[in-house]
UniProtKB/Swiss-Prot annotation:
Names of the cofactor(s): a divalent metal cation
Gene Ontology CC terms: cytoplasm
Top EC category: hydrolase
Catalytic activity: a ribonucleoside 5'-phosphate + H2O = a ribonucleoside + phosphate
Keywords, alphabetical: Cytoplasm, Hydrolase, Metal-binding, Nucleotide-binding
Location relative to the cell: Cytoplasm
Protein name: 5'-nucleotidase SurE
Entry's family note: Belongs to the SurE nucleotidase family.
Domain of life assignment: Archaea
Cofactor binding note of this UniProt entry: Binds 1 divalent metal cation per subunit.
Location (main, coarse): cytoplasm
Chain positions recorded as a divalent metal cation binding sites: 7-8, 38, 90
InterPro entries associated with the record: SurE, SurE-like_Pase/nucleotidase, SurE-like_sf
């Protein structure tokens, strides 16, 4: 089966289109948050109970996108084999390493990859996004899922797919490297009506991204980007760490 999830909530338009595409290929079910959970990464619920609310073709749950994956795998559909996780279609792109670590859309596929299930995260740029544009993405999504079910790259855990907002029937699909960071951050301090300070976190995008990075493909080339991701975020070569440890003198500190 194909598990369909997202971080915009089970009733978002994007997940409906994604489910429609997935269900045309294989048995598919939705397990997704009961409301928007954007920018929650791989957050997981540990200290409060989770609740699941059944509807025609899946469940809405009270947790995060990653919880949706765990609930599907270990509780709601534990009698079925999940062959692929598809997440989205997110309202807004998910490009750069910032999104890799903060996006709930990608976070759901990361949770799946860590328990051995490959996944695809689908997102669309805010620029020009509409239900009609999301509908236009459906044949592309169907083609990508069909291909993934047959020949998902062995050395890849997740495919991160981003659609331009002004998608059309002639839009190309291009491979893209993930840009390092496309945001310049800032914190704005203000006063509430009672004179107490509060803060807004914000950022602006910059265009310092090399050719063929995800930003370049989506925004400069007006194309669909597909970025391969692996969840292995560590180095096998321990030599530099061994050298670092050699300079730690604990005995001297302990006296």
């Amino acid at each position: 089966m194909i598990l369909v999830t997202n971080d915009d909530g089970y009733n978002s338009y994007g997940i409906r289109v994604l489910y429609r595409a997935a269900a045309s290929i294989a048995e598919s079910y939705i397990v997704a948050p009961d409301h928007g959970r954007s920018a929650t990464g791989m957050s997981t619920t540990y200290n409060v109970p989770l609740r699941a609310f059944k509807f025609d073709y899946g469940y809405a749950i009270s947790g995060f996108p990653a919880d949706s994956v765990y609930m599907a795998r270990y509780a709601l559909y534990n009698d079925k084999k999940i062959d692929l996780i598809v997440s989205g279609i997110n309202h807004g792109d998910n490009i750069s390493l910032r999104s890799l670590y903060s996006s709930g859309t990608i976070g759901a596929t990361m949770a799946g990859a860590l328990i051995g299930i490959k996944g695809i995260a689908f997102s669309m740029s805010y620029n020009g996004i509409s239900n009609e544009k999301i509908d236009l993405a459906e044949p592309y999504i169907k083609a990508i899922i069909e291909n993934a079910m047959e020949r998902f790259p062995d050395d890849v855990d997740i495919l991160n797919v981003n659609f331009p907002g002004n998608l059309n029937r002639n839009t190309r699909i291009l491979p893209a490297r993930m840009s390092y960071n496309i945001f310049d951050d800032n914190i704005i301090k203000r006063l509430d009506p009672n004179g107490h300070e509060y803060y807004w976190f914000g950022n602006k995008r910059h265009e310092r991204c090399p050719e063929n990075c995800d930003y370049d493909v989506v925004y400069r080339k007006n194309s669909i980007s597909i970025t391969p991701i692996t969840v292995k975020g560590y180095l096998d070569d321990l030599r530099s760490t061994e050298e670092f440890i050699s300079f730690i003198n604990v005995k001297e500190l302990l006296g």
